[in-house]
């Protein structure tokens, strides 16, 4: 399975007057109102990930709230670190999560906005693999492709020969199976056919 870890970010202000880029009624901008609003958003974002294809395993989402200092709490990174070794894809949703790019994983940003595109471009500039999906349809298609790649990478082909290098196609003629390993991660094991009779 392709293991996906959703990380749902949110900027929650410490006082109603914080944040020059927001406006509204005081009662809607208090820390309590913002917390309640993000609680609803967090639940809705998790619901978007229900009923994924059977080859996709979605781990419980991580609540990545931070305040106007734009520092992700260490507790968020501790939650990620506890499961990062089994994760194939980090799935940032909602607001960006500062310093998430520290992880050398594939990023698939589920957000239809400029922040997702900007974060993806930033990750790519650091050499990370990163994509943006604007909706569930995009997400399903991309995760399926990443799952196929994972399956191919974990595939081992046994090629039995009479000692000569086998050909792998009529037109393509891939003479060097090492190309398949380097490009796709697929391991090719070549051995004489007589060895299976020992």
Language model features: what each stretch is:
Residues 1-198:
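An N-terminal assembly and electron-transfer interface module characteristic of large anaerobic redox
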